[in-house]
Amino acid sequence: MLLDFFVLIGISNCFSLIFFDIKIEGFISIDCGATSDHWDESTDIFYKSDKGFIDTGTNNEIAPEYYYSNPDYGRQLRNLRSFPQGTKNCYTLKPEQGKNSSYLIRAFFYYGNYDNKNQVPKFNLYVGLNYWTTVDLQNIATPAFPDIIYVPTSDIIYVCLINTGSGIPFISALELRPLNKSLYPIDEGALYNGWRYNLGTSSDDKDFVR
């Protein structure tokens, strides 16, 4: 299966439905490295710890001085799971809708100097057998939020972190959201988010497009 390319145009009202309405059936929200499940007040979403989704890796906490201050993101960027052992470590997702459905999958990465090395790692991310992206953070205090639209041919989706020899892979959070398949009608495979534009927002926004 080839990894196709798409431009995702986000309209604020649509994204509020996709990301902030916990009542939508089929959400999977994982706070990687968390010791327990919790309700995130900033997003109104219930996050589960990654116990049961993966059995490898090590839980780590971000030092308070590196807490990410953006109010749109809550506790899930205050801890992470790192993978010092093995070349390939995978999360196992079992969405309620099963195979041949369309899903938006988003991964969160925030280094925050959790290991006190001041050295941002670089590693690859796969969904199933498809290369998704290379996680290459700008600095220790800048997060990354890559997302992808994926239509699996199996009831199980594997999201895998691949050690490429440039530092220990880690992940802060992982989310899956079911989509109406008519939005991006593909039978199988993946669509990678190339750009995102905010239409109709304040002209002060540097990514403003009307």
Show where each model-derived region lies:
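Compositionally biased, intrinsically disordered or flexible polar/acidic segments
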Residues: M1-R210
